[in-house]
């Protein structure tokens, strides 16, 4: 699996892994698998992180770089499921005027009730960080929101 990676990808993985190697001994707590993958511009769901060995608690499992490289390769290979374009198409369904905007309240509803749901306590910081101000009619442009959420800016 790692043979599918370019030398540049392997170097990027080594660098990102080293950031989460807090002990400096070539290992990383599996709790940080998702964070490390996100640092490598991947956006795995919680289900994917769990599937590849990520843990919900610290110190449940320790992995080596040699174990993480194939994890990265697999998630990178599968990243087309749920691409930026797919998410854009979903948000366009809520763009009734076809002008690049949607109701702020609808976005809140989507984030609280569909897919990997956010908790109410998680919602406010996400919207504050990623959303432009809503206009006087309660609409926001959804493309800047999506770009920030998928780290494409």
Swiss-Prot record:
What InterPro entries does the database record attribute to this sequence?
A: CALM/Myosin/TropC-like, EF-hand-dom_pair, EF_hand_dom
Task: Give the Gene3D superfamilies listed for this entry.
Answer: EF-hand (1.10.238.10)
PROSITE patterns registered for this protein in UniProt: EF_HAND_2 (PS50222)
| GO CC annotation terms, alphabetical | muscle myosin complex
Keywords of the record:
Allergen, Glycoprotein, Motor protein, Muscle protein, Myosin, Repeat
Q: Which residues form the EF-hand domain?
A: 8-43, 82-117, 135-153
Q: Does the keyword Repeat apply?
A: yes
GO MF term (any one): calcium ion binding
Tell whether Membrane is among the UniProt keywords.
no
Summarize tissue expression.
Answer: Muscle (at protein level).
What temperature behavior is annotated for this protein? Thermostable even up to 100 degrees Celsius.
Per the UniProt annotation, how does pH influence activity?
Stable at acidic (pH 1.0-5.0) and alkaline (pH 9.0 and 11.0) conditions.
Q: Name one GO biological process term.
A: muscle system process
Q: How is it modified after translation?
A: O-glycosylated.
Subunit relationships:
Myosin is a hexamer of 2 heavy chains and 4 light chains.
**What name does the UniProt record give this protein?**
Myosin light chain 1
* Encoding gene, per UniProt annotation: MLC1
């Amino acid at each position: 699996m790692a043979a599918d990676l370019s030398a540049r990808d392997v170097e990027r993985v080594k660098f990102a892994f080293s950031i989460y190697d807090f002990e400096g001994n070539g290992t990383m707590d599996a709790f940080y698998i998702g964070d490390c993958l996100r640092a490598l511009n991947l956006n795995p769901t919680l289900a994917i992180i769990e599937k590849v060995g990520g843990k919900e608690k610290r110190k449940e499992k320790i992995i080596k770089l040699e174990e993480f490289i194939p994890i990265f390769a697999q998630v990178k290979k599968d990243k087309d499921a749920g691409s930026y374009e797919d998410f854009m198409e979903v948000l366009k369904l809520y763009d009734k005027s076809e002008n690049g905007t949607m109701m702020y309240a609808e976005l809140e509803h989507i984030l609280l009730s569909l897919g990997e749901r956010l908790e109410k306590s998680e919602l406010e910081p996400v919207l504050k960080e990623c959303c432009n101000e809503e206009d006087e009619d309660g609409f926001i442009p959804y493309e800047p929101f999506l770009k920030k959420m998928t780290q494409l800016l």
